[in-house]
């Protein structure tokens, strides 16, 4: 069972649903990245384009032991890639970390973080149609 989302997401946070049924949150901008992080639990998975600017994506899990299928990891990575500096490439390198290892930096712009422990880094295809396919009412 997945944790329910709070009613009324902030305007700057987009909701997607992976084909495996996981809720995926993506910030629309720096403030949206901050808002998405605040909605996440320590055991949720955080994704971001490697070595450059982009949106944060959160994969919500019911608990820390809940496995996330490869397809969901790739789809969430694709959503991160579509709103990153790698959006025009064929593939993008995405980093993955548990939220407990993602820390906001003080005295910096909203959405700037430090990652203490990355558990994966992988290339995913950049597919802009993915955004439409994973919308909740698509």
Residue locations for each model-derived region?
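Duplex nucleic acid-engaging cores and interfaces of nucleic-acid transaction enzymes
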Residues: 1-138
């Amino acid at each position: 069972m997945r944790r329910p989302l709070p009613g009324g997401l902030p305007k700057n946070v987009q909701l997607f649903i992976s084909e495996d049924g996981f809720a995926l949150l993506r910030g629309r901008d720096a403030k949206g990245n901050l808002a998405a992080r605040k909605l996440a639990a320590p055991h949720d998975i955080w994704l971001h384009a490697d070595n450059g600017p982009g949106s944060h994506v959160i994969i919500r899990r019911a608990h820390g032991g809940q496995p996330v299928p490869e397809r969901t990891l790739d789809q969430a990575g694709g959503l991160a890639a579509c709103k990153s500096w790698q959006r025009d490439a064929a593939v993008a390198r995405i980093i993955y970390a548990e939220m407990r290892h993602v820390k906001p930096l003080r005295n910096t712009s909203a959405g700037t973080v430090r990652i203490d422990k990355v558990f994966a880094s992988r290339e995913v295809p950049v597919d802009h149609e993915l955004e439409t396919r994973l919308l909740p009412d698509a």
